Amino acid sequence: MGYEKPQIRSTTVIGIIRDGKAALGSDGQMTLGNTVMKHSTRKIRSLYQGRFITGFAGATADALTLLDRFESKLEAYSGKLDRAAVELAKDWRTDKYLRRLEAMLAVVSTDKALIISGTGDVIEPEDGIVAIGSGSMYALAAARSLMKHTTLSAEEIVRESLQIAADICIYTNDHIVIETL
């Protein structure tokens, strides 16, 4: 029996574009193994002069490293989201150090939503909803239903989706932070 490194599990991040407006939110829980370490971790950031909001899931230090790299790519490519995401993904796949990072990013603007995965993939969901993290599938299901059957705003859908995920996923809490564009 050897020492097993505790797995960092945390979070639900969901972003939505609706009616020319975008919202991205996350819960605040950070869990190490089976212990809640923090209830109010901030996992979303506004980037590039407030034109984009990004959120992260996974190992916090890894995610912050990727977030910093992504912000640098946005600056280098004058805020061109697709180009910055693809260039980050290329680096992620080819750099020995980055390849070992365990994190994902979700990014929204008023007209585009992307997921940059832990394998270096760039995914643009066709419904304008991005969700990452341990409770992402619960939040995604809730958001899709709310988008289809209500007239709620992007921010309201994000809030309700995160609350539903928090009610189901043990790695998601109800300390919700949302930013909008």
From Swiss-Prot:
Lineage: Bacteria, Pseudomonadati, Chlorobiota, Chlorobiia, Chlorobiales
Recorded superkingdom: Bacteria
Subcellular location(s) per record: Cytoplasm
EC number(s) reported in the record: 3.4.25.2
Family: Belongs to the peptidase T1B family. HslV subfamily.
Residues involved in Na(+) binding: 166, 169, 172
Catalysed reactions listed for this entry: ATP-dependent cleavage of peptide bonds with broad specificity
Regulation: Allosterically activated by HslU binding.
GO biological-process terms attached to the record: proteolysis involved in protein catabolic process
GO CC field: HslUV protease complex; proteasome core complex
Main location per the UniProt record: cytoplasm
Function (record text): Protease subunit of a proteasome-like degradation complex believed to be a general protein degrading machinery.
Cited CDD domains: protease_HslV
GO molecular function: metal ion binding; threonine-type endopeptidase activity
Self-association state and partner proteins as the record states: A double ring-shaped homohexamer of HslV is capped on each side by a ring-shaped HslU homohexamer. The assembly of the HslU/HslV complex is dependent on binding of ATP.
HAMAP family in the record: HslV
PANTHER family from the UniProt entry: ATP-DEPENDENT PROTEASE SUBUNIT HSLV, METALLOPROTEASE TLDD
Protein name, per record: ATP-dependent protease subunit HslV
Keyword annotations of the record: Allosteric enzyme, Cytoplasm, Hydrolase, Metal-binding, Protease, Sodium, Threonine protease
Catalytic residues in the record: 11
Organism: Chlorobaculum tepidum (strain ATCC 49652 / DSM 12025 / NBRC 103806 / TLS) (Chlorobium tepidum)
Enzyme category, top tier: hydrolase
